[in-house]
Amino acid sequence: MKKDVRILLVGEPRVGKTSLIMSLVSEEFPEEVPPRAEEITIPADVTPERVPTHIVDYSEAEQSDEQLHQEISQANVICIVYAVNNKHSIDKVTSRWIPLINERTDKDSRLPLILVGNKSDLVEYSSMETILPIMNQYTEIETCVECSAKNLKNISELFYYAQKAVLHPTGPLYCPEEKEMKPACIKALTRIFKISDQDNDGTLNDAELNFFQRICFNTPLAPQALEDVKNVVRKHISDGVADSGLTLKGFLFLHTLFIQRGRHETTWTVLRRFGYDDDLDLTPEYLFPLLKIPPDCTTELNHHAYLFLQSTFDKHDLDRDCALSPDELKDLFKVFPYIPWGPDVNNTVCTNERGWITYQGFLSQWTLTTYLDVQRCLEYLGYLGYSILTEQESQASAVTVTRDKKIDLQKKQTQRNVFRCNVIGVKNCGKSGVLQALLGRNLMRQKKIREDHKSYYAINTVYVYGQEKYLLLHDISESEFLTEAEIICDVVCLVYDVSNPKSFEYCARIFKQHFMDSRIPCLIVAAKSDLHEVKQEYSISPTDFCRKHKMPPPQAFTCNTADAPSKDIFVKLTTMAMYPHVTQADLKSSTFWLRASFGATVFAVLGFAMYKALLKQR
């Protein structure tokens, strides 16, 4: 909504433009009227819309054509004043003023016009019969007001309508020729309906309508008022109400009715509450609220955000199979201007045997987006109506900014829940196998993945000491030197192929170049351990290398298994990320890993039991 309103009054000489302004300000008819009133500013606190309003007079005797053109270009709304007792001034509305204004304004964003019939005190008839054809001919005319500066009749109403034409314009909402709402308005209201339909049954029930009424207008509707609204819809269209709920068709009809009856401020209140600007686009302020992220801090979703996402998943999981089918996912994204997830997402998070994103996979993808691109996450939550449905100031309330990692190292504990692991190794050493194994996929399932659907990321939950954490794996492409972005992480997984004698040398070189003197813990993984192991062409063996650099011994790993691959290395990687201060002696201790793994096993079993219990409730 505009921050202020600039109203320009034009018209033939002596129709009463200046008198109208002076009568508004002094609340009495002036005995002496100057040729032109000075610009007047009405403060926000005395206007109905709480917006500062500037009223500008035009005098043909005192101002040039150039000055008039400048005033037109600066105005938000123009009042064309005529005298109801002067036919010449009425004729000039169409022969001079409307063409002049339209010549000076962009065709795609015509200025709203108000026709003002002054001096109604001098006649006993109305000029409306003459004016109505003009209003029908020019769609930029918002309304016509007959008034009297002498009797103070409709003076405040005139300026209220002018304000309203700027702050709540009809143009973006409604096409008078077609007598229906414009496509952009229908699209915006359809999104609002889908967000408000919290059980996704295609209708707004009484509870949903009451919530909608409260968040938009700060007041609930009485039961009888709700019934009256539905009766109005029933009276006009047959399929506007179903099962005592308002359908999308009924919802759109109501707003069409508001606009046709001059109540378009009601529709604008709804649109603006859901983040729309005057062009019916979602505002940057709504989609991208301010969120300060200091250096060495990461971004995670908080508990309230996960609850919201859980309810979003449940809303669209219509068959209750704990996975979103392509159609269910498409339905979820109908409130987005585009489909945000590509086929690579299905290979980034957990899916069921049909390749559909599971409940856990859904939450994981949101966790990944928040961590890697928090602005994109805020945008997506905005499309879903997070701040509205949770009654928060903005989507920023869904995000936790973690403390500086240096503080974690000093205090020897972390509050983070998401840990990034960069997976490094030569091409074809088995990195993608490690990523897919995190999602529980063995080699047979991995072979079904199309090349163009592959992902360089994988994310899933891992239990360490009974705590659920997210492990985010990032496959780093092979290169001679790593960039700073490729080095920054919580833990490094250096992968080599036991069957390729040239594979380990790269891991050793990268470790020495970038990680030997850093505080980032590293784990070496001996991939494809089901194959015949060959001697690595390096000065010392991988085992001796680990011993020399006080690292845990190489971890044998294969995804060529009948069932899901072992998750041991993921528990170890997450543990190392959580406790980077732990000594290498502890990391090599079997008791240390046993405690971590035992906690993971117990909580995985408990988690599965709770998951089944939730399923039964659903």
From Swiss-Prot:
Mitochondrial intermembrane-facing ranges: 616-618
Entry keywords, A to Z: Acetylation, Calcium, GTP-binding, Hydrolase, Isopeptide bond, Membrane, Metal-binding, Mitochondrion, Mitochondrion outer membrane, Nucleotide-binding, Repeat, Transmembrane, Transmembrane helix, Ubl conjugation
Catalytic activity: GTP + H2O = GDP + phosphate + H(+); ATP + H2O = ADP + phosphate + H(+); UTP + H2O = UDP + phosphate + H(+)
Residues binding Ca(2+) 1: 197, 199, 201, 203, 208
Transmembrane regions: 593-615
Effect noted on mutating residue 13 to V: Causes constitutive activation inducing an aggregation of the mitochondrial network
Binding residues for GTP 2: 428-433, 447, 528, 530, 558-559
Biological processes per GO annotation: cellular homeostasis; mitochondrial outer membrane permeabilization; mitochondrion organization; mitochondrion transport along microtubule; regulation of mitochondrion organization
Listed EC numbers: 3.6.5.-
Subunit architecture: Homodimer. Interacts with the kinesin-binding proteins TRAK1/OIP106 and TRAK2/GRIF1, forming a link between mitochondria and the trafficking apparatus of the microtubules. Interacts with RAP1GDS1. Interacts with ARMCX1. Found in a complex with KIF5B, OGT, RHOT2 and TRAK1.
Protein name: Mitochondrial Rho GTPase 1
The species this protein was found in: Homo sapiens (Human)
Organism taxonomic ancestry: Eukaryota, Metazoa, Chordata, Craniata, Vertebrata
Gene name per UniProt: RHOT1
